[in-house]
Design a protein with these regions (language model features):
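A glycosyltransferase accessory/donor-loop signature
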Residues: 45, 50-189
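Extracellular/periplasmic catalytic domains that process cell-envelope and extracellular macromolecules
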Residues: 11-12, 40-42, 120-123
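A recurrent flexible, glycine/aromatic-enriched loop bordering the glycosyltransferase active site
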Residues: 36-47
Length: 189
């Protein structure tokens, strides 16, 4: 929705990853489940700045495989859980505007007083909107205030946006037509 130049230019030399802190129903239980201290919180992996040099030095792919093999029963949110479990000490939180998750619009997350301004600014001027969960902007019943923006940008990029309401009506009309016009047949034994 907005330029990512500022995000792209962020210095991440001393960290492995920069991402937005996830303030969702999962955010307090995930660190406990993943066996790291709660005070490190939890980040969303939807938008990340990755320090590839640090990941290579850590042999991160091998570390992920090893973690998954020994902790698979604790992993609920796939890659995101693994990333948090392995990088919780080597991350930096970035502004919510770089990954405004749509559940922020519907939930009432606990906002620390020091993040209130960031929250308000992100809602007024998001840079990246992340449609998490079941509400997707291409679905007829999506009530996101950013749905129209999504459709406008999709059309600008040449994507055909289906009006799901019409698709659903067509589907039911087709079924109804088949049921009503079905020829009666007689089974002969």
């Amino acid at each position: 929705v907005d330029s990512i130049k500022e995000l792209w230019e962020k210095n991440i030399d001393n960290i492995a990853v920069a991402a937005v802190e996830e303030r969702s129903p999962f955010d307090t239980e995930s660190p406990v489940t993943l066996k790291y201290p709660v005070e490190y919180s939890y980040f969303n992996s939807g938008v990340m700045l990755i320090n590839l040099q640090k990941w290579r030095e850590k042999k991160f792919v091998e570390a992920c495989k090893s973690y998954i093999a020994s902790n698979y029963e604790n992993i609920k949110l796939h890659d995101q859980d693994v990333l948090n479990a392995l990088l919780y000490k080597e991350k930096q939180f970035i502004s919510i505007r770089w990954n405004l998750m749509d559940f922020f619009l519907y939930a009432s997350p606990e906002i620390q007083p020091e993040r209130k301004k960031d929250w308000d600014d992100a809602l007024k001027s998001p840079a990246i909107i992340h449609f998490t969960g079941k509400r997707k902007p291409w679905m007829y019943n999506c009530d996101s205030p950013f749905r129209d923006q999504y459709i406008r940008f999709a059309k600008q990029q040449g994507w055909h946006v289906i009006n799901n309401k019409n698709a659903i009506h067509y589907f039911f009309r087709k079924i109804l037509y088949k049921v009503i016009n079905k020829k009666k047949t007689i089974k002969i034994k």
